[in-house]
């Protein structure tokens, strides 16, 4: 488990390139036959990836010990979106088939969660967010057909994109975790511009569907003290509440967003006009 401490905005603006990457970038999300895990002190979110290839992968009791509990989800909820080949997730003996871009919400209290791929040649890639939970909601699979897509932006401003809200109150109940997937239309480069912050929630972005020769310049920092982190395929970035979170790519891309905090009101944002950015 990689533990990341909280950081004050006044400190963050003094960091150089490597300092920013050390604090906020999750560089390696998927490792064959293992789970990766980054624990942030910011709202106690955990992010990572699970890629079973030649064997099943489960999160062992050692994680429970690190969290001060008996097992991983004793006091937590889990959201998973599969960006790879078809796979399965077995929760306390109940097996769920999770295809490409299918998702699974696992409620607090699940003791055994086992991840597997159907075909080792095209392994599943389970990207997950995990947050503290106060009560148990039912484990539920969510497919792309159950998510009402919303298209925003314009080709003229290079920000036409489709937002798919997987784990939001209109789809299913969670304690605090919200997750979704945003896909840019071909030829579009910007996400979340004009940008915003949200004082009441933190957020994590996971960028994927990027060619090897492509990158995204992820914008962060306070609106009047902006910085950037260069992102490559299948990397994640932590965004504190005080930070904007936007990006521009060399080509179109897709990203998964996950939020935890005070509420689950998607539109609860503190908008920032482009003219006010520095």
From Swiss-Prot:
<keyword id="KW-0862">Zinc</keyword>
<feature type="binding site">
    <location>
        <position position="245"/>
    </location>
    <ligand>
        <name>Zn(2+)</name>
    </ligand>
</feature>
<protein>
    <recommendedName>
        <fullName>4-deoxy-L-threo-5-hexosulose-uronate ketol-isomerase</fullName>
        <ecNumber>5.3.1.17</ecNumber>
    </recommendedName>
</protein>
<dbReference type="GO" id="GO:0042840">
    <property type="term" value="P:D-glucuronate catabolic process"/>
</dbReference>
<dbReference type="InterPro" id="IPR021120">
    <property type="entry name" value="KduI/IolB_isomerase"/>
</dbReference>
<comment type="pathway">
    <text>Glycan metabolism; pectin degradation; 2-dehydro-3-deoxy-D-gluconate from pectin: step 4/5.</text>
</comment>
<dbReference type="InterPro" id="IPR014710">
    <property type="entry name" value="RmlC-like_jellyroll"/>
</dbReference>
<dbReference type="InterPro" id="IPR011051">
    <property type="entry name" value="RmlC_Cupin_sf"/>
</dbReference>
<dbReference type="GO" id="GO:0019698">
    <property type="term" value="P:D-galacturonate catabolic process"/>
</dbReference>
<dbReference type="GO" id="GO:0008270">
    <property type="term" value="F:zinc ion binding"/>
</dbReference>
<comment type="subunit">
    <text>Homohexamer.</text>
</comment>
<feature type="binding site">
    <location>
        <position position="203"/>
    </location>
    <ligand>
        <name>Zn(2+)</name>
    </ligand>
</feature>
<dbReference type="InterPro" id="IPR007045">
    <property type="entry name" value="KduI"/>
</dbReference>
<dbReference type="GO" id="GO:0008697">
    <property type="term" value="F:4-deoxy-L-threo-5-hexosulose-uronate ketol-isomerase activity"/>
</dbReference>
<dbReference type="Pfam" id="PF04962">
    <property type="entry name" value="KduI"/>
</dbReference>
<keyword id="KW-0413">Isomerase</keyword>
<feature type="binding site">
    <location>
        <position position="198"/>
    </location>
    <ligand>
        <name>Zn(2+)</name>
    </ligand>
</feature>
<dbReference type="GO" id="GO:0045490">
    <property type="term" value="P:pectin catabolic process"/>
</dbReference>
<feature type="binding site">
    <location>
        <position position="196"/>
    </location>
    <ligand>
        <name>Zn(2+)</name>
    </ligand>
</feature>
<comment type="similarity">
    <text>Belongs to the KduI family.</text>
</comment>
<comment type="function">
    <text>Catalyzes the isomerization of 5-dehydro-4-deoxy-D-glucuronate to 3-deoxy-D-glycero-2,5-hexodiulosonate.</text>
</comment>
<dbReference type="InterPro" id="IPR027449">
    <property type="entry name" value="KduI_N"/>
</dbReference>
<keyword id="KW-0479">Metal-binding</keyword>
